[in-house]
């Protein structure tokens, strides 16, 4: 009797445990406590809702970044649709090793190691979406689609392509894998060019692929286009000239900037060496920098026109004054500064024409430090030009109170002052506009009447300096005769 009772007790315990385990399995499979024989209608409803939830998902809607055009509507940078390969690690994680072998052909196509793929699945096993390969080619996408694998699908993204090539790359800059501007104009105008992703509700098949768009929850917003002042044809010609002469003279680098002085538009801005914008491994080091705005230089003899402007704008000199450069050399701060030969007595215009260092030093030494500093400062050396170009450096023109006699003398021929090529061209643009300042811009100006102008330097004196500069290329003693062009 006691034995039978024990047997009955053990059977009861086993039965209760079995019922408990069965109930737990049912609950884990997605049933809830209302799904019993007394609530069949409610049970069917719940099962339908669960199935519906498993088929429904939300996906982001990507759209294109704004296009960059040159002044003649030539496309320089644009975004093209690409497919991004996605997997569902949460479902792949539960597959048997034998089933995972079906994914080996996929890994071969994209060049992914099997061990790394397993690590990804394990590490991100809670995630329902993982980007296995971003922005694959159409050819690669087609090969993958033919495999018809579960839990593998594509979403649409956009990839930046640069039609301007190397000649524009360190001016336009580039974006990262997420289409966010990292350098150049892509960074400067990122808030304008950037798109805003949308959201949609989709229905999936049993492979995890979107088969139907149920609802657009949030519309995507495409980035705005911009039109640059740059001219593609001139830019390419200029870049090729830079490349030719850097290679010819084994120079480290060269830069070119061309400004339409009446509007302030930058028509060309080229640097060599540059980089291929389609090869991401080249996007590092000095090649990616726009040296026209980032590289600090001593302007040298290009400062002499501004020195003579300062001289004529002061009470110390007149147009008729003569400067004696004999004997053709001078000691400044322990160094001997020379002219190519003893030019003797020179007018102020001839100091520019012959690019006389001795003449420039003698003029600078006779000026009051304050007068010299104020006149050079008129041309915005050391100022923020507010072009909006990312990475713009300002250079430095130290206050005259910090100058010693040596620095005062050397500024006359462009040493002891630091600037950029952009600032130097801005200063010459003011001269070319006869003393009027017009802000420089890399964007095309559609309405000329809207151009801001401010007279900051004497008009007649600016014209006088332009005349002196013309003699540099036209007169027989000019140091720039080879730059003289007919009909220009």
Task: Tell where the protein language model's regions lie, with residue ranges.
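Beta-lactam-recognizing serine transpeptidase/beta-lactamase-like catalytic domain environment
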Residues: 75-77, 204-214, 256, 260-301, ...
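Periplasmic/cell-envelope proteins involved in peptidoglycan metabolism and beta-lactam response
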Residues: 1-280, 370-380, 481, 485-487
